């Protein structure tokens, strides 16, 4: 049995989120949540919410036992960039891209 949870357009770059995702891929749920709880990174908080959402989906929709689940796959894809401008000298402006990403977590037995 596989259960998914997806967070689209998370306001953090995919590169930073992949660092956290690589730490919990393939781990049991309890160990993955423990690692995410004690990680100081902003991405850890966002990934933890997606993992908890997948757990709730498994319990509510499939009636699964949470203790048996593990993080089978976690995929972080690049999302759309928010384009902003910052003021520069002599009346010019430079473009800044604020990165987003899509996080997909799949839990299985």
UniProtKB/Swiss-Prot annotation:
Listed InterPro entries: Ribosomal_uL22, Ribosomal_uL22_bac/chlpt-type, Ribosomal_uL22_bac/org-type, Ribosomal_uL22_CS, Ribosomal_uL22_sf
Keyword Cell cycle belongs to the record: no
Cellular component, GO, one term: cytosolic large ribosomal subunit
GO molecular-function terms, A-Z: rRNA binding; structural constituent of ribosome
Pfam families linked: Ribosomal_L22
Function field: This protein binds specifically to 23S rRNA; its binding is stimulated by other ribosomal proteins, e.g. L4, L17, and L20. It is important during the early stages of 50S assembly. It makes multiple contacts with different domains of the 23S rRNA in the assembled 50S subunit and ribosome. The globular domain of the protein is located near the polypeptide exit tunnel on the outside of the subunit, while an extended beta-hairpin is found that lines the wall of the exit tunnel in the center of the 70S ribosome.
The protein's assembly and partners: Part of the 50S ribosomal subunit.
UniProt protein name: Large ribosomal subunit protein uL22
Organism (species): Polynucleobacter asymbioticus (strain DSM 18221 / CIP 109841 / QLW-P1DMWA-1)
């Amino acid at each position: 049995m596989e259960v998914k949870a997806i967070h689209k357009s998370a306001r953090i770059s995919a590169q930073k989120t992949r660092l956290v995702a690589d730490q919990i891929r393939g781990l049991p749920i309890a160990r993955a949540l423990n690692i995410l709880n004690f990680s100081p990174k902003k991405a850890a908080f966002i990934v933890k919410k997606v993992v908890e959402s997948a757990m709730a989906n498994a319990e509510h929709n499939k009636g699964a036992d949470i203790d048996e689940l593990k993080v089978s796959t976690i995929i972080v894809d690049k999302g759309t960039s928010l384009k902003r401008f910052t003021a520069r000298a002599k009346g010019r402006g430079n473009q800044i891209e604020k990165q987003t990403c899509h996080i997909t977590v799949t839990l299985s037995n």
